[in-house]
């Protein structure tokens, strides 16, 4: 019997010292400060109009800090916090304070009934910087605060680094202090509703969210519920260049939308909200360049098409939008959506071949390492460009999806063309990259093999079009404990390779999305039992932890310190795998009856 997650299932699962309390659509992140009785609020915004460095947000201090809950005398209260997806509850010596989102820009603090109580916080509404010739001051965001209680005191005091704000109210029943952070020039305070109404609205939003998701096996229910919370919590509303409601990989570490992340996020959303899944794809396609290229990343104030490190060049991400769109169509058919996106995806496909094949041999290259999504992989240690099996496999899969799209749209001649092109490309990969002695596909640099052993050397398995003998050789590598097998699989560099580092990003750790791709590859080649084992292994690896992480140590299964938490595609593929596992077990039960 499958279970569907509930709010109770996630009570106190969200650790706000490490994981932001936020809400669907919001760019406000509430944290507990260093396990103390204080809070702070960060902004999930790059704000490049203030600091042009596109990664400055990673180092930016909180917008609001030293948030304290105070008593009648203005004393800061110690608290114990309890978390739920819809509300934080702070137990103090004078009663319960609560915090919920009234809307995506308004944090509502519910005061303990029958008390004189309030909040105090430090606001830093300006950014300043000393320069060689002087200094710069820029506004960050506007802030308003107000209450539906009788105000006993209200002070704004200039202090070093900003302003200290203190507001104390007579808290009869349902009294609230609202703090709103505005993304525009507005300074109109938000309407203050009774806290019971605010909490009911917040609770109903999350109940509605969880009601839409399919059931899974009970052993995965808690992490499954948390993964769906991440899929909701990481959503941001349309603003600026973000044209649709879309999901950030992490509101802490990855502010913006990334191309291939968006495709993987759509995998999960298709099970609960197909329109939201479609909008993940639309949000990326909205910014296609005239030459067909799609951006690496999109954020409120801009787009990332080029990067100047480790080399300068154009940057995108692997072309898996068509693959994801086909999966979405299989779950929730929409011919009009296929008709809408097909021409743009064809242009993106053409860009890869026209701008990333310097030797004109029909094998596509990565010109910038970051276009691979495998930023620090040892595949790029020896210079660029690199003709890698993974990008050419992605393109084969894209053309496989195009074949289906053309058939769906009644364009049979075009479907036949894509089928021929896909098989022709695969033949070139076999001719140029296959090493019969090694039993794998090498990446090429200056037409010479790069003998760095990674799972990406096995990627053509995923096409489902190789000979049985080739498939067998590739799977042998996958299962070899000295290479990619072992207790924690699949490492992103072979354990036998001198570049292997189990803790460092794409130089060895296990990534859930790569495992997902190989589950599909094994299924396509008729190895269902191995696919099930890898699926169960991946589900168990992720379930061992209280959060969903970017990657996992290939020796210990633990998330390294550098791995982002509340990570989107790990949550997404966990959801998709858990649903598949449940459907398989349900089918097995029916067969046995």
Residue ranges, per PLM feature:
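Terminal accessory carbohydrate-recognition/targeting modules of carbohydrate-active enzymes
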Residues: 1-219, 260, 272, 524, ...
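N-terminal start-of-domain structural block
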Residues: 149-180, 218, 294, 299-300, ...
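Short N-terminal secondary-structure initiator segments
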Residues: 186-195, 231-255, 311-350, 438-447
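Extended, well-ordered alpha-helical scaffold segments
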Residues: 194-201, 205, 219-226, 273-286, ...
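Extended glycan-interaction surfaces of carbohydrate-active proteins
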Residues: 217-256, 285, 290-311, 357-387, ...
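Aromatic-rich carbohydrate-recognition surfaces in CAZymes
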Residues: 255-368, 389-392, 396, 509-525, ...
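Structured, solvent-exposed acidic/aromatic patches
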Residues: 385-392, 412
């Amino acid at each position: 019997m499958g279970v569907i997650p509930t709010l109770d299932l996630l009570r106190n699962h969200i650790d706000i010292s490490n994981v932001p309390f936020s809400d669907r659509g919001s760019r406000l992140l509430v944290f507990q400060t260093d396990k103390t009785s204080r809070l702070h609020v960060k902004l999930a915004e790059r704000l490049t109009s203030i600091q042009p460095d596109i990664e400055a947000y990673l180092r930016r201090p909180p917008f609001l800090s030293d948030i304290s809950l105070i008593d009648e005398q203005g004393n800061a209260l110690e608290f114990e916090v309890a978390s739920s997806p819809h509300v934080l509850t702070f137990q103090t010596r004078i009663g319960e304070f609560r915090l919920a989102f009234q809307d995506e820009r308004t944090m509502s603090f519910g005061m303990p009934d029958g008390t004189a109580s309030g909040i105090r916080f430090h606001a830093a509404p300006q950014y300043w910087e000393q320069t060689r010739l002087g200094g710069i001051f820029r506004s960050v965001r506007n802030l308003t605060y107000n209450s539906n209680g009788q105000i006993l005191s209200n002070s704004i005091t200039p202090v070093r680094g900003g302003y200290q704000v203190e507001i104390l109210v007579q808290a009869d029943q349902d009294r609230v202090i609202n703090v709103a952070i505005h993304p525009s020039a507005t300074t109109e305070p938000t309407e203050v509703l009774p806290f019971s109404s605010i909490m009911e609205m917040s609770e109903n939003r999350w109940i509605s969210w969880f009601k839409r998701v399919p059931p899974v096996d009970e052993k995965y229910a808690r992490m499954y519920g948390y993964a769906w919370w991440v899929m909701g919590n990481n959503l941001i509303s349309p603003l600026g260049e973000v044209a649709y409601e879309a999901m950030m990989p992490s509101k802490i570490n990855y502010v913006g939308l990334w191309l291939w992340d968006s495709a993987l996020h759509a995998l999960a959303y298709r099970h609960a909200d197909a329109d939201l899944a479609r909008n993940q794809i639309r949000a990326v396609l909205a910014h296609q360049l005239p030459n067909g290229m799609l951006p690496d990343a999109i954020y409120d104030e801009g787009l990332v098409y080029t990067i100047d490190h480790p080399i300068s060049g154009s940057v995108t991400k692997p072309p898996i939008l068509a693959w994801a769109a086909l999966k979405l169509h299989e779950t929730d058919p929409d011919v009009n959506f296929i008709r809408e996106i097909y021409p743009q995806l064809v242009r993106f496909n053409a860009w890869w071949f026209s701008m990333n094949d310097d030797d004109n041999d029909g094998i596509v290259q990565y010109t910038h390492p970051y276009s691979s999504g495998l930023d620090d992989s040892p595949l790029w240690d020896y210079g660029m460009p690199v003709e890698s099996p993974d990008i050419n496999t992605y393109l084969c899969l894209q053309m496989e999806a195009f074949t289906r799209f053309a058939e769906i749209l009644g364009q049979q001649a075009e479907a036949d063309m894509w089928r021929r092109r896909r098989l022709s490309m695969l033949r070139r990969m076999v001719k140029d990259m296959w090493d019969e002695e090694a039993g794998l596909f090498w990446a090429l640099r200056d037409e010479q093999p790069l003998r760095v052993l990674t799972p990406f050397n096995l990627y053509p398995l995923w096409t489902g079009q190789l000979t049985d003998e080739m498939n067998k050789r590739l799977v042998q590598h996958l299962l070899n404990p000295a290479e990619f097998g072992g207790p924690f699989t699949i490492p992103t560099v072979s354990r036998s390779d001198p570049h292997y580092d189990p803790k460092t990003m794409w130089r060895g750790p296990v990534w859930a999305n790569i495992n997902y791709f190989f589950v599909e590859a094994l299924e396509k080649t008729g190895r269902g039992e191995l696919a099930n084992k890898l699926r169960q292994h991946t589900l168990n690896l992720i379930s061992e932890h209280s959060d969903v992480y970017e990657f996992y140590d290939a020796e210990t299964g633990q998330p390294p310190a550098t791995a982002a938490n509340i990570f989107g595609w790990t949550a997404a593929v966990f959801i998709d795998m858990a649903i598949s596992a449940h459907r398989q077990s349900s089918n097995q039960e029916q067969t046995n009856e």
